[in-house]
């Protein structure tokens, strides 16, 4: 990850979902369904990430916001963040595929409902949602577990000192163009933008994940350990 080499640069299997003109809402979960039936993934890290989303769901129910509560429940079922899978490989080699969260996600929306849906997606993925300080009063209404994952931050688009790994945007084309223009002027790695129409709730959770594949030479590790230091 982040290094040059001969392997794929765009990403792993989740990248294929970007090539679809249409996709089912549960596309992320279905991607791994067949393999997981044979060998269940390691999901301890995933389970540690879900309490914040569960707290947001319970809060939505207490506020009479059935739509947000339903979205939280669906995201909890679909998210694959924090899961690890051992891949098939040759003897003497162990390959592990892990999905990790994009740590800092900027939420850009003109309505509170869209902002909360974006936040639910970020919590489902295990990251932190960046909100404008103008939404401080709304943040204060959230349960403590959800509040801990929401950071108030202005100028995240233009301030290069602010860590930013992804952007969720609900709005029209003109507003989206302004966001993309600001991001293009930021130094450092390219930050991806997921754009949706106002009111959309089918946020592609895979856009908030990082795919990591780790290969370990178990033959060398179990034999002459000094071989692991050569390179």
Give names to the regions the model predicted.
Residues 1-104, 108, 112-113, 125-128, ...:
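C-terminal segments
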Residues 118-119, 180:
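Short glycine/serine-rich donor-binding loops of glycosyltransferases
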Residues 119-125:
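Conserved short alpha-helical elements in the N-terminal third of ANL/AMP-binding
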């Amino acid at each position: 990850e982040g290094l040059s080499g001969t392997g794929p640069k765009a990403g792993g299997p989740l990248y294929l979902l970007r090539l679809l003109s249409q996709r089912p809402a549960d596309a992320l979960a279905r991607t791994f369904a067949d393999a997981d039936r044979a060998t269940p993934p390691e999901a301890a890290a995933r389970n540690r990430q879900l309490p914040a989303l569960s707290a947001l769901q319970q809060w939505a129910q207490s506020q009479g916001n059935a739509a947000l509560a339903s979205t939280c429940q669906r995201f909890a079922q679909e998210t694959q963040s924090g899961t690890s899978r051992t891949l098939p490989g040759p003897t003497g080699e162990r390959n592990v595929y892990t999905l990790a969260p994009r740590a800092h996600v900027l939420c850009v929306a003109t309505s509170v409902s869209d902002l909360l849906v974006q936040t639910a997606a970020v919590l489902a993925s295990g990251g932190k949602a960046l909100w404008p300080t103008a939404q401080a009063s709304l943040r204060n209404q959230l349960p403590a577990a959800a509040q801990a994952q929401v950071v108030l931050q202005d100028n995240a688009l233009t301030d290069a000192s602010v860590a930013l790994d992804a952007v969720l945007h609900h709005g029209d084309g003109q507003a989206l163009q302004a966001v993309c223009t600001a991001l293009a002027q930021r130094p450092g790695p390219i930050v991806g933008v997921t754009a949706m129409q106002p009111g959309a709730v089918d946020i592609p959770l895979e856009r908030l994940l990082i795919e990591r594949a780790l290969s370990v030479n178990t033959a060398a590790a179990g034999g002459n350990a000094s071989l692991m230091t050569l390179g």
